[in-house]
UniProtKB/Swiss-Prot annotation:
Family annotation (PROSITE patterns): TRYPSIN_HIS
Signal sequence residues: 1-16
Protein name in UniProt: Inactive serine protease 35
Organism: Homo sapiens
Keywords of the record: Disulfide bond, Glycoprotein, Secreted, Serine protease homolog, Signal
Top-level taxon in the UniProt lineage: Eukaryota
Compositionally biased region (Basic residues): 191-207, 229-238
Cellular component, GO, one term: extracellular region
Residue pairs linked by disulfide bridges in the UniProt entry: 154-170
Region Disordered, annotated ranges: 191-250
Sugar-modified residues: 90
PANTHER family (alphabetical): INACTIVE SERINE PROTEASE 35, SERINE PROTEASE
Gene: PRSS35
InterPro entries noted in UniProt: Glutamyl_endopeptidase (IPR050966), Peptidase_S1_PA (IPR009003), Peptidase_S1_PA_chymotrypsin (IPR043504), Trypsin_dom (IPR001254), TRYPSIN_HIS (IPR018114)
Species lineage: Eukaryota, Metazoa, Chordata, Craniata, Vertebrata
Biased composition (Basic and acidic residues): 208-228
Length: 413
């Protein structure tokens, strides 16, 4: 049943009917020239305290409805939000100021678009539509193999051989870095092998025999000890066979973390939900296939208005959970959606599958970061939504700068 469902999810053609009419047939990735973000100057800051409590929800934030009433940010404001902090594994911290070039400010910055009308409820809506990925044929292969788990309790996604994209609130509460983020680790799923990761015992014996053998060789006591050792090995072997085939995590330390100043405000105001994303650089590269970053299209350019993401929901211990759902509302920076999700899945990479215009095949790219279940200000009233932070051209340029260290490879996205 699971295999049939996943086949339908991943191989259904990219057309659908919504509200009785066919959506626009332009489901392709369109490369566009993006603004340049250039590092201007880097300052050393005092080391953070690492004392904040990890939060799965942000306190009251300005959501889509609230954004409609805001003026378009000026260039200097955007440069302030896109400047970024870097915290290193030894606890040191820097602030990098940036300049934005080749940006055309549009007067319709905060226009919003309605998607499919959906009944609003909390994190899980009626019948739970999440799917635990248990079959190792899917679990260890793309796209599911790109999902990772953070030691702070969130999820993330591989976007390069050495980088993970996640939500900023998973490592920083807007004022300070969360407890445990100084020694942050990322867990990559792998399958246990037959030996359980232990070395064979025969090597020690062969070395002993090569050096002249054991003085007790041939005695009754020695034979009895060898028999007991054999029984112990048989018992441990049974335990290894039980563990064989189950997924486990291979944990890797994080070398440094980048967070935009739009989120890491310190004492200079509240964190902005639009900038709830962070990039983690791993100490060592992985060998898995990663998912490329893309720029979020409008709802009309999403097949069926649907998005997909996988993460490690807390109510399903160490299971990778996949879901897909419709986007209900969008602004330039946020997506409201009603995917069933629990805490632990925040930080997951939200992706689409569109046509690659050059190769004419379908390709998945990350177009948002799942920020989680958030309380937002709607005309002075607090309402709860599931929110994802969109990858805009500016954010694409910033994350690309973080990955490559310069903007040479970030002209198009």
């Amino acid at each position: 049943m699971e295999n049939m469902l996943l086949w339908l999810i991943f191989f259904t053609p990219g057309w659908t009917l919504i509200d009785g009419s066919e959506m626009e047939w332009d489901f392709m990735w369109h490369l566009r020239k993006v603004p340049r973000i250039v590092s201007e100057r880097t300052f050393h800051l005092t080391s953070p305290a690492f004392e904040a409590d990890a939060k799965m929800m942000v306190n009251t934030v300005c959501g889509i409805e609230c954004q409609k009433e805001l003026p378009t940010p000026s260039l200097s404001e955007l440069e302030d939000y896109l400047s970024y902090e870097t915290v290193f594994e030894n606890g040191t911290r820097t602030l990098t100021r940036v300049k934005v070039q080749d940006l055309v400010l549009e007067p319709t910055q905060n226009i919003t678009t309605k998607g499919v009308s959906v009944r609003r409820k909390r994190q899980v809506y009626g019948t739970d539509s999440r799917f635990s990925i248990l079959d190792k044929r899917f679990l260890t292969n793309f796209p599911f193999s790109t999902a990772v788990k953070l030691s702070t309790g969130c999820s993330g996604i591989l976007i390069s051989p050495q980088h993970v994209l996640t939500a900023a609130h998973c490592v920083h509460d807007g004022k300070d870095y969360v407890k445990g983020s100084k020694k942050l680790r990322v867990g990559l799923l792998k399958m246990r092998n037959k030996s359980g990761g232990k070395k064979r015992r025969g090597s020690k014996r062969s070395r002993r025999e090569a050096s002249g053998g054991d003085q007790r060789e041939g005695t009754r006591e020695h034979l009895r000890e060898r028999a007991k050792g054999g029984r112990r090995r048989k018992k441990s072997g049974r335990g290894q066979r039980i563990a064989e085939g189950r997924p486990s995590f291979q944990w890797t330390r994080v070398k440094n973390t980048h967070i935009p100043k739009g989120w890491a405000r310190g004492g200079m105001g509240d964190a902005t939900l639009d900038y709830d994303y962070a990039l983690l650089e791993l100490k060592r590269a992985h060998k898995k296939k990663y998912m490329e970053l893309g720029i979020s299209p409008t709802i009309k350019k999403m097949p069926g208005g649907m998005i997909h993401f996988s993460g490690f929901d807390n109510d399903r211990a160490d299971q990778l959970v996949y879901r897909f759902c419709s986007v209900s509302d969008e602004s330039n920076d946020l997506l409201y959606q009603y995917c069933d999700a629990e805490s632990g899945s925040t930080g997951s990479g939200v992706y689409l599958r569109l046509k690659d215009p050059d190769k004419k095949n379908w390709k998945r790219k990350i177009i948002a970061v799942y920020s989680g279940h958030q309380w937002v200000d709607v005309h002075g009233v607090q309402k709860d939504y599931n929110v994802a932070v969109r990858i805009t051209p500016l954010k694409y340029a910033q994350i690309c700068l973080w990955i490559h260290g310069n903007d040479a490879n970030c002209a198009y996205g």
